[in-house]
C-alpha cells in the first residue's frame, strides 16, 4: 500500500526588490527618529520628582510659618520672657517702664533658615519662629543650614615660622661633567660628589678643597651613600654597577650585580646591613651588604625607579617612579603594602623628615606631603614650582629645599607649606644658559649648610643670611581659601 502523500503549500515567489523593501520598512520601524525622541513631559511625574528633591534637601528643617505672629494684648497681659535683646535706654525713659518691648532687637534663627527657591512656600503646623535641627539628620543637611557659622579655612591653616633667607657663599669647581649626586660624611668633615665624568670626588666641608678622586665607574655616577656604621661608601651609576668602597684603602671591595640597566638611586638602611637600589629596569633591589646577595627584587613599577628611602623604626621601603606612583614595600616579605597615585607626573625626588613621621615628594605638577607609616595625604605645598624637580632635602629646623631643572631653587616652611624664598642659580662663566639645572641637594648633619650639584659642572654651598631679621625679611603669607584633598 503506498504511503500517503502530504501536499506542500505553494510558496509565493517574491522578487529580490520586494524582499529588500520589506527589510527596509522593518528597519525604519525600529530605528526611525520617533524612537529617539523623549516622551512628552508628565506633570504628575515632574511634581513627584520636585517634592522628593525638596524633601531630601529641606526635610530635616522644620519650616517657618509665613503668617505674622499674633500681637499680644499689652494692656491686660504682663510682659514675659522673650527671644529679644533689650537695648540699654536712659534712666527714667518711658521705654523702661513698659518692659522695654519697643526698643528690642529680635534675634531669631534667620541665619539658620534654608534659602528656598523662588515661588516655593512652606507651611507647617507650628507657629513658633524657631528652626529645629534634629540630631539624626545627615551631615550634608546640617552643613547646609549652618554654613554661615562654620569656621573659615584660613583661620585653621598653620602660620609659617620665620626662617632666614639662604645665600650662596661658595662655588666649587673640579668636575668635568654634570654633577649628579652628593652625600655627607657622618662626622660632617667631608662630602662626596658623583659626576657624569665617571669620577667620585671627596671635598672638605670647611674649606671646599678637593681631598681625593676615586675612579672605577665607566658611566656617570647617579647615586652615593656613606654608611654611619662602617667605613664604607656606596656608589651606583648608569653602567649597571653598584660598588662598595673601603674608605680606609680607597678602593672597591665589593660589587653588586643584578640590575639590567642603569641604577638611578641608592639608599642605606639606618640600622641594618641592607642596601637599596632602584634603576631603569623598574625594579628596586634589596642587597645584603656583607654577602653581596640580592635579598629581594621589589618589582611592581611600570617605569624607572628614581627615588628611594627607608626608615629605621619600621621595616618599610618607599619608592618613587616615573610611572607617577609611590609604593610602600614591606621589607620583611618583599611585598607591596600600598600604592599612592596622587601625582600626575614622574616622582623624581622624595625626602624624609629627620624628626617627624612624614615625607614629601616632588613632581612637575606639585609638591605633596604625606604622613607615615600609612602614607596618608596631608596637603600640597602652597605654591607650584613650575619645572621638573630633580632634588629635594629637609633639615631638622623645618626648612625644605627643592631644586628644579631650570635652575630654580625654592625654600619652603615644612609645617605650613609656604615658600619663603625663591631663587635662581647663576650659571658660571663658560657654561650655557641652559645648563642651569640642579640635580642633587643635601644638607650637612647640622642642617646649617646646603650643597647643590648642578649642570654647569659646579658644586654650590649655601647658608643662612646672618644679617637677616624678621623686620628686614617679613613673611608674605596668604593662607589658602580651600584645602585640596588630592
Curated annotation (Swiss-Prot):
For this protein, the record's InterPro entries field holds: G-protein_beta_WD-40_rep (IPR020472), Prp46/PLRG1-like (IPR045241), WD40/YVTN_repeat-like_dom_sf (IPR015943), WD40_repeat_CS (IPR019775), WD40_repeat_dom_sf (IPR036322), WD40_rpt (IPR001680)
Q: One Pfam family for this entry, by name?
A: WD40
Which effects follow disruption of this gene?
Hypersensitivity to glucose and sucrose. Enhanced sensitivity of plants to stress and to growth hormones including cytokinin, ethylene, abscisic acid, and auxin. Accumulation of sugars and starch in leaves, and root elongation. Cell elongation defects. Enhanced susceptibility to virulent and avirulent pathogens.
Q: Which pathway is this protein assigned to?
A: Protein modification; protein ubiquitination
Cellular compartments annotated? Nucleus
Q: Where is this region: Disordered?
A: 62-101, 465-486
Please state the protein's primary subcellular location.
nucleus
* Sequence motif: DWD box 2, positions: 317-332
One GO term describing the cellular component: nucleus
Q: List the cysteine pairs that form cystine.
A: none
Q: Where are the WD repeats?
A: 174-204, 216-246, 258-288, 300-330, 342-371, 384-413, 433-463
Residue window of motif DWD box 1 = 275-290
Q: Which SUPFAM superfamilies match?
A: WD40 repeat-like (SSF50978)
Comment text on domains: The DWD box is required for interaction with DDB1A.
The protein's name in its UniProt record: Protein pleiotropic regulatory locus 1
Source organism of the structure: Arabidopsis thaliana
